[in-house]
A protein has these predicted regions:
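C-terminal substrate-binding/catalytic lobe of Rossmann-fold NAD(P)-dependent oxidoreductases
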Residues: 1, 93-96, 100-101, 107-205
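N-terminal Rossmann-like NAD(P) cofactor-binding subdomain of oxidoreductases
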Residues: 1-108
Length: 205
């Protein structure tokens, strides 16, 4: 890997959780190479790969000039894409966000990991703190996660509470009308319908 790094300006580190920090210290920092890490790494403590968790919808400009940046997990990225437009449009009128993550047990390509026939609840998963790293620690965001025995996909259930006047359904939908990476489906009954629709658009899972 050293010879390839000597010819590189930027590394996208997709190694397993905890390996990114080792690669940073062993390979990237000595060569002064810019690096992007995936969500399994940390942004706080001795094992932090960066002091910034990146979300293109929230803090794109803040990443300019950074040597090391961590890209959030798919769940953390998805929450940012949905919640940030609501924050921008309705701001101080929002009382709190309550998010329930229904997480798949294992990714489709993780064939070596068995899907256990059980359901697990995590009251305070890391996803909430990860999102607060770019929303602000005082953001009224409350997250819990339920892990279910499927490989299909993740599902987010979001309850947005407003202080007084609640926006109409049309106002909420219009918030996402021009959002990149967000689609409104009226006929999907379940995650399979969403996957089938995404497949027709040539999205990769």
């Amino acid at each position: 890997i050293e010879s390839a790094l000597d010819e590189s300006d930027l590394v996208i580190d997709a190694s397993p959780s905890g390996i990114g920090i080792k690669n940073k210290k062993l390979f990237y920092e000595p060569r002064d190479i810019m690096s992007i890490y995936q969500g399994g790494e940390a942004i706080e403590g001795d094992n932090a790969v960066s002091d910034m968790l990146f979300n293109s919808r929230v803090n794109y400009n803040d990443a300019v000039g950074k040597k090391h940046v961590m890209q959030g997990s798919c769940n953390v990225t998805g929450m940012g894409r949905i919640l940030e437009p609501l924050r921008k449009n309705f701001g101080s009128s929002i009382k709190r966000f309550d998010v329930t993550l229904v997480r798949r047990w294992a990714d489709i390509e993780q064939t070596d990991e068995n899907v256990t026939d059980t359901i697990e609840l995590t009251q305070s998963p890391h996803h909430g703190e990860d999102v607060k790293s770019y929303f602000g620690k005082d953001s009224p965001l409350f997250v819990r996660a339920i892990k279910v025995p499927t490989r299909q996909m993740h599902l987010h259930i979001m309850d947005i509470r407003f202080k007084e006047n609640t926006p109409s359904v049309d106002e909420i939908h219009n918030t996402f009308k021009d959002e990149y990476g967000v689609a409104t489906l009226w006929s999907a009954k379940g995650t399979k319908d969403i996957r089938d629709f995404a497949g027709k658009l040539n999205f990769s899972f």
